[in-house]
């Protein structure tokens, strides 16, 4: 009888346990399902509740279209290449200075605009507003470009600005002369129409962004700091409009960068005794270093998906995916581990999951029959927002775990702070309003820049740095960035001018609408 009672109690316990598990699973699925069909993180804006400041419209005439296109092409034809921090094309930068002065006469002659050359080749414009109580903002772009070689397979010479099927080809068309010329062209049109801003703003054009901005952006910031300038927000290049680039996403999306990954380059070196190849030692400097590099590649940095801005990106986009992706992305609190394992399979999405490891240089040896005494390698890490530079260096040390390998940091910096992007974030909401006002079909989401810009130098004078330009990228276009056949459509360049024209006026809004004004109506 006792045995029977014991079995009965055990069976009762198992039934209760099974019921609890089943109930928990059903509850989880119910919560996840409800969240899937209700999560829609600020997909649009209710424009009726916004203060209306736009009084000037831009209807481009045929002659204006021809002129703005000619101005842009002239900018592309000037090879403002930055090779290294100490080697830039100074004659091209001087020529570019002359171009700006000739094609934007209102900008350089208006009493509202103060122009200063900084660091010999960079430009700072101060556009005076009528209300000194409004905190100023700043628009950034950069004049310099990376090198380009026609022999790499360009369809047109990289500094020809040649038109092919409605596109302008050339280095700088999407990085970043479309913003340089677009910003100044928009300001030129506004000044021609008698525009006076309510809110003071600045325009900063760096000349060495591609080589860290140490003479351009750094000196612009020093000048502004010396004057006690504090900025409401900064808008620089970074992310773009992605149309068909994100697999499974219904419609195009505008991603506004709210942070950048950190970065460090580490030098690994091994020194041993040299020798002749006829009497090789058990281990060589090359072999020891190769083993260290292999350990770094075979043991990637930990998965951190969901602990940085990428979570907000996926949640903002979730409602534009079909099932089952919508179900998964709407419930990252439940599915982050699963999704991270899927994303890490491809290099372009693995960058969202972790700090990436890239072996970029490996040098050793002077002759085929001499065993070298020295070998060195350089490894670049792009640091996830949830990690620090110090944590990465410690993981490198523990992963290699070989005292014979000397580890030195060449350079590095932590991930950039995450800029605000909620309903009361002035900069983010103004940019979003401008994007949706022009392209109501877009979904706008915050994003993370896996590359770096010189906007990081502005951290001391603003809390919010955003990285976006309305360049449209279709499948294959992201590879043109710093690559072969960089190009922009004529229509898209006109849209960029329109975007900045509208953005400057939208920034004259004094206050954002009350919270919870976001609707799904735009």
Curated annotation (Swiss-Prot):
Record-linked CDD domains: M20_yscS (cd05674)
Signal peptide as annotated in the record: 1-35
E.C. no: 3.5.1.114, 3.5.1.14
Any one GO molecular function term: metal ion binding
One biological process term in Gene Ontology: amino acid metabolic process
Family as reported in the entry's similarity comment: Belongs to the peptidase M20A family.
The name this protein goes by in its record: N-fatty-acyl-amino acid synthase/hydrolase PM20D1.2
Organism listed in the record: Danio rerio
The encoding gene: pm20d1.2
